[in-house]
Amino acid sequence: MLGQVRSYDGDSWVDWQWVGDHLDDIRNAAQTHLVLTVEVVVLGVLLALPLSLAAARRPALRSIVLGVSSVLYTIPSLAAFALLIPYTGLTSRWTVLIPLVSYTLVVLVRNFISGLDAVPVEARAAADGMGFSHRQRVLRVELPLAIPAIMAGVRLATVSTIGLVTVSAIIGQQSLGLLIRDGLERDFRTLIVVGAGLALLMAITADLLLSACSRALTPWRRAR
């Protein structure tokens, strides 16, 4: 991926000349890592939201959804990749997407349900008294009031996914994990530092941005 590693000062943690020579490769790895993370989280939200809305109203379904998502979360990512490779292929994006989306569900579903459970009974009663249909009540009352818990789940899922995407380098998926893997294989610390550092920076930045989005979507909380 990154060509030959030239000799460098072994006492230095980062070979800045090498970094400058491979900026395009590093940028591509970071961009692919970010895109894959966004795909995983978006798919996770699209699955978790309807599941949570249905499970919040049905105790039996809630137990099933939470139980299944928890079981999926216990499967190691490498084992999940190995199980899927015969069906999706070694280089298929779905080999990574399916397990990582499954992992987000345990975080997203629990937070979404907690947020819906926290909606005051009085708010639901007021919506019913105003003649809202069930759909209107969910869209205009319950989901807005559940936003803090929903966004907390999205933040946690995003940060954890950024870390998990690095593991996909084991099966050759392009990401910042490839830098770390190549650095370990070549005993070249610059690759390790750049890959791990950018993944950490991406996680911190994503968390701050999502936290700001959460505050922007809940102006009534700032007024307290």
Cite the ranges covered by each PLM segment.
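C-terminal transmembrane helix and the adjacent membrane-cytosol boundary/short C-terminal tail
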Residues: 59, 114-117, 121, 193-224
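Short cytoplasmic-facing helical segments at TM-TM junctions of multi-pass membrane proteins
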Residues: 111-150, 176, 180
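Transmembrane alpha-helices
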Residues: 134-167, 194
